[in-house]
Amino acid sequence: MASVMQKLITPLASGPAEPPRNKVTIVGVGQVGMACAVSVLLRELADELALVDVVEDRLKGEMLDLQHGSLFLKTPKIVADKDYSVTANSRIVVVTAGVRQQEGESRLNLVQRNVNIFKHIIPQIVKYSPDCILVVVSNPVDVLTYVTWKLSGLPKHRVIGSGTNLDSARFRYIMAEKLGIHASSFNGYILGEHGDTSVPVWSGANVAGVSLQKLNPDIGTDKDAENWKEAHKMVVDSAYEVIKLKGYTNWAIGLSVADLTETLVKNLNRVHPVSTMVKGMYGINEEVYLSLPCVLNSSGVGSVINMTLTDGEIGQLKSSADTLWGIQKDLKDL
């Protein structure tokens, strides 16, 4: 006797189901991982979302919670497992796993604790999705993106750190608030390390093509009577402030990662300040990952924009690179 399903549906296509075309995997279902997952889902960027974590109950709970919202989403398949086979055929893999930054702890203090975790994670990802683009979010993100590149064996253009995409977004928000305009109408970049040695590019800051440095040649310096450099200090302090108030940061980084994911999946060729291999640029001679304005597309980092930086800004970038190299050179087992 025919089942309800057999009576209801007449199949036409035969053979195996089509593999996913825009599968996104999130490794780590903590606060940041789930903010990334929800942001990707709400922007309708994936035809399959996979979640991976070592804490099985939490992982299953998050999967079920998202699946129960399927009616309100456009992602037909949401899966989760601690086994990395669930991530197979991913286009984008977002790595948020790692130990969390503590209040007052600098991002660079986190590094060796997270390196040991990555030695398990990264080879598993590449085993099941050898053609993926890896987006590293875990802190300290620049060093861990370098670690990911070394452990993965992937070409450098397919290993990206979320870098200063969020720092730049914070900068644009803070500056725009001071100017009474929307964040998208203030153009400015934070480059270098995602963290304490980040570099504000005051020479390029503008609104509608009007250079702020031309209006105020001292902008961003100690001589500036208007003290605009306070905006960059607020960017550097912002994560620490949010962590102090609520224990972690997650929503802004989740939105930032979804923004990057959209550019990669849709082959948009948009420019984002993300962490990439900078050896040979701006006089940097070491293999370090730092944020520069990168053209992102379906290949990963398609190219890097050569910004016209001042000597002071280039000096700050080199200093940022030196800070990171000081950590990297002591890493073990890479």
Curated annotation (Swiss-Prot):
GO terms for biological process: lactate metabolic process; pyruvate metabolic process. It is found in: Cytoplasm. GO terms for cellular component: mitochondrion. It is an enzyme of class 1 (oxidoreductase). Pfam families: Ldh_1_C (PF02866), Ldh_1_N (PF00056). It catalyses: (S)-lactate + NAD(+) = pyruvate + NADH + H(+). Pathway: Fermentation; pyruvate fermentation to lactate; (S)-lactate from pyruvate: step 1/1. Its EC number is 1.1.1.27. GO terms for molecular function: L-lactate dehydrogenase activity. Transmembrane segments: none annotated. Substrate binds at R107, N139, R170, T249. The active site is at H194 (proton acceptor). Keywords: Cytoplasm, NAD, Oxidoreductase. NAD(+) binds at residues 30-58, 100, 139. PROSITE patterns: L_LDH (PS00064). Belongs to the LDH/MDH superfamily. LDH family. NCBIfam families: L-LDH-NAD, PRK00066.1. Homotetramer. This is L-lactate dehydrogenase B-A chain. The lineage of its organism: Eukaryota, Metazoa, Chordata, Craniata, Vertebrata. The gene is ldhba.
